[in-house]
Every structure is written in C-alpha cells, then in structure tokens.
Amino acid sequence: MKVALLSETSNAKAFLVDDAWCAQEKLNGERMLVEKAGAVVTAHSRQGEPRTLPATVEAVALTSELDFLLDGEWIAGQFVAFDILSINGADVTALPQSARFAAMAEVSPFRLVRQALRKDKSALLASVRAEKGEGLVFKLRDAAYMDGRTEAGVKFKFWKSASFIVTDLDIAKGTVGLGGFGRCSFPFAGVWPKVGEVVEVRYLLLTKNGKLSQPAFLGVRSDLTAADVATQVIA
C-alpha cells in the first residue's frame, strides 16, 4: 500500500483557527510502515521496500497483544507513529482521522506523534518552533486515510527543506556537493553519504542564481529515489 503524501502550505493561520483540522508535529525522519502479525514484525519504506528493524523495536512491537499496521517515521533511533491502517487484520483506513488516532493510542506500543486540537494547535506550533523543530502537519479530522497524494493533509515548515542527489564529497573541507544547488557542510562525525544517494537538506531560501542559502545537512533519505527527487519543485 502506498502511504499518504502531503502538499505544502505557507499559511498556517488558516488551519490553526479552523477546528476541522488537527495539528501534529512534523518529524524529520525516514517514513516507515511497521506491521505486527502474530509473532512477526516487519517494516517497509514508503515505496514498499523492506526495512530492517533493531531487535529492541521488534521487542516493543511484540508487547502489544493486538496485530497492527502503523504509519510513522524512524527518527533518532526510535519509531514514532502518527497513523494506523489496520487492527487485528481489519482495515481501518475508512475511519475518520480522529477515530484512527484514538484507536492508535489504544493499540500502539510505540510513542505517538504530538497532536493538538482547537486552541492547543497554536501552543503546539509555538513549542515546536521554540525547540527548533521542522514544523507542523495539519490533517482533516473527519478524513479517511488516502494513499498517494491527498488534500486531507498539508505540511507547514518553518524552514524549507528538499531532497538532493549527492554529486561529490569533499571530506577535507567537510562538505557535500548538491550539484547545481551548491554545497552543504557535514556537521557531525558519522558515516558520510555516498555519491548518488539522496539526502535531505534544510535551507533558508533559493538565491537568484539558484543556490541554497544557509543549507544544513539533515540526513540520508533511504526512503527516496532519484526519480522522487526529479519530481520535486525547489523554490
């Protein structure tokens, strides 16, 4: 099954004041579906490719007495759930988002994404901004889960971010080449991305000469391909 994909908005206020929409913290991890079926726990990327989970994560999943299929993100060594697609083999994607989130809170053994309703949405936005988070995701509370591109959810980001193909590495200077968009620094000790891999980069704006302003390396996007990068609009 394809995961739900969101469009982007620059106007958070309209969604903050509309009670038809809830707000969730926007995470900056790898999109992942995690399924428990009996004693078997599996994970897949947004394209349906299998992913290997640490034994600790499998152990957490197996603490649930119920089977489930969760949509979420792998971030900072843990899985964070933000939607549920099935419970004990029963498809729940036709349920409204509000009902699915409530059911997920009962079923999921994993941490849930922070969600806020009504007036609490503004407080969540302020909290995420103060923590230097990425932004918020707004979802229609009465909408079913739709795979592929959907209008039932939008993302609002404090900074812009996009995915780029690594064209070269300058390890001596600690920078990653992003083709015609310039270079970003590799700010921490770790495993360098490979040439040809897709990486996520945060930036302030795109300059008049097509370069990224204040780019910051966020991580490798193993859930994306070069074809995905080719279809995005960078502005």
Give residue spans per PLM region:
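Nucleic-acid 5′ end/cap handling module spanning
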Residues: 2-48, 109-223
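Acidic, low-complexity intrinsically disordered tails
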Residues: 228-235
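Catalytic nucleotidyltransferase
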Residues: 50, 56, 60-159, 235
